[in-house]
Amino acid sequence: MTVRESAFVNGRWLAGGGVEFESLDPVTQDCLWKGAAASDDVVGQAVQAARQAFTSWGRLDVSRRIDIVKRFAELLEEDKERLADVIGKETSKPLWEARTEVASMVAKVGISIQAFNERTGVSEQDVAAGHAVLKHRPHGVLAVFGPYNFPGHLPNGHIVPALIAGNTIVFKPSELTPWFAEETVRIWAKAGLPDGVLNLVQGARETGVALAANDGIDGLLFTGSSPTGHSLHRQFGGRPEKILALEMGGNNPLIIAPPYDLKGAVHHTLFSAFVSAGQRCTCARRLLVPDTAEGQAFLDELIAAAANLQVGRYDADPQPFMGGVISLRARDQMLAAQNKLAAEGGRILLEMRSLEENASLLSPGVIDVTDVQELPDEEHFGPMLQVLRYRDFDHALELANKTGFGLAAGLISDSRDLYDRFWLEVRAGIVNWNKPLTGASSAAPFGGVGASGNHRPSAYYAADYCAYPVATLEADQAQAPAQLSPGMSL
């Protein structure tokens, strides 16, 4: 495969200038895309192009910006099957799920327009000091870092509101999903986005460090792992003038508490733990069940159902529930994590296994870690669910909050009283009741606390960090007051 011109700067495709890398099909290991990482020089060109485009883009009437964003959504809809196929090939996500990702990208446009008007619109009122006006301005040049698990939907959740607000962008996707990022940028160009408004730099850590360190950016919007987010936070230390929005991972608890519908509880747990092969930041990582005969009966049903989940290629017919994890490296990391927990006292209830020698396909795994003395507070990004048995609901809440993360938490129980207490006491930015933990609405804020984020939730609240408020007192004419301040004469 030939090396592509992988950087998009000021409306032109350029050679990246850095080290060459590939995107591989996680299951077949076929090369899907080959390009070069953006060098420091190309990163600088991209930032400069965004800076030059900012003046005209930011001054363009918001209705014109929205027209272009709406055209982008129309083009996504027209090309949705091909785009879903690209997502499926590059991530191993089954087509049924890849289609929902493209649909989410389309829906994000209308939601972002509504959020812009509601969260960052114009308000006016007469006050004692004069006429008060609140408006919002774009920050300027924003870097957007995207993850691999939702290579379209998640960066789109930053890019769309940032463009509506009048910012220009330098986009650095995950080095594991460069192909879909390229396809997205091509659609933006086709939608009529002016040159320089959206620029693309490909690459891994070195490219990200260079972009984050560039003095020409006014902020950075990040979705990804907690270690990378913490690294960016350290890199931004001493730079309070830069906006930094971090949406990171979680070690999310899901509590099962009687009474509950057994089939409903099993379904929601399976979906929470294993959808996307466990590669959603909101996936349940820790399952808290009562240490009773009823709790054991629930686990027996869960394990039997998990063992029957279908795993396979993204385009298999009939469709599987799960595809593979993102890479062979990710597969090996998950198997190593399972082995480590077992060595530390965990009891494997359903073994996570590699299903093909040179493929990233993993079967679901469930491991009882109740007896692990020093349970690591880590996000294992794959199809492995850890079980903790609790004595009573006080103990369940204690275990749920025994994490430095704070992204998502869920309760499966018919008891409203337990839920009311759970909502008040659990520490998380997303709290679900009798719904899958992975269920979240773009019409609501999305984000967490602690090691899961820095209190700048995305989704509906992305509008808040894509523009800053400007408070104004206005009068048609400067007039001296009827009574001057003490010690003043005119």
Swiss-Prot record:
PROSITE patterns: ALDEHYDE_DEHYDR_CYS, ALDEHYDE_DEHYDR_GLU. Its EC number is 1.2.1.71. The active site is at residues 247, 281. It comes from the Bacteria. It is an enzyme of class 1 (oxidoreductase). Keywords: Arginine metabolism, NAD, Oxidoreductase. Pathway: Amino-acid degradation; L-arginine degradation via AST pathway; L-glutamate and succinate from L-arginine: step 4/5. GO terms for biological process: arginine catabolic process to glutamate; arginine catabolic process to succinate. This is N-succinylglutamate 5-semialdehyde dehydrogenase. It comes from Hahella chejuensis (strain KCTC 2396).
